[in-house]
Amino acid sequence: MRVVTQNAVTCFQNGGNGTFSNTRVVTENGISKMYLFGNLIATLEHKVGGVMKITNAGWESNTTRERLNGLPNVHIRQVRGEWFLNGQKWNGQLTEV
């Protein structure tokens, strides 16, 4: 895992705010949001038992996949151009994990 991903994920999980290269974490009202190049890719509702949702925001890039894979309970891989989330084909739409 890249250092920028590790730092962003730690901030995201701890409910912090920060910018890490092309990744920004903003926390307001108990909800952390992770942005990559200005696109929302993950949310974490700290007050609701840690409900986390992810999306690729329409970008099937290596960087998007790498940032999302840094999150707990997220394993994304690409096979023949198709993305799989935790072993299931995934279209990149907002999904609770």
Stretches with model-predicted labels:
Residues M1-V97:
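Terminal leader/tail segments of proteins
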